[in-house]
């Protein structure tokens, strides 16, 4: 089972809005909200997002779920079924009651997390990745800045990363191409 577990965006955004409201109530004019995302390495979610219409934030979040399409006759007692764009789908649910994301969706989820956090009250975004990869980080920053050109972004320069080894590997990979 994957280690990191996310929650739907609306749950996280409610916390950002609560902090912003607390600043207003307390008269704090220079408070800074830092949103942190390390969803890139998360493969599971705690719950399915509430969605009201196609394309809303909940729908976008649920589109990352690992699902199987099924017919009504194939439904089992206790199944969780989603009507996704007119099709019935069953998200992959683990015995722990967590839901699994599709492989390869981490970067898209992280970019969506980042953009929605900044659009909903975060002043600064702290991005984490599973390893220091310049191309990956740069690509994510560019995608965020396409939507929010003045986004204030910081990166987790973790000493737990073996920076030298990772950069050597990236140079080697570039030479091999």
Identify what each model region corresponds to:
Residues 1-161, 165-177:
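Alpha/beta enzyme core
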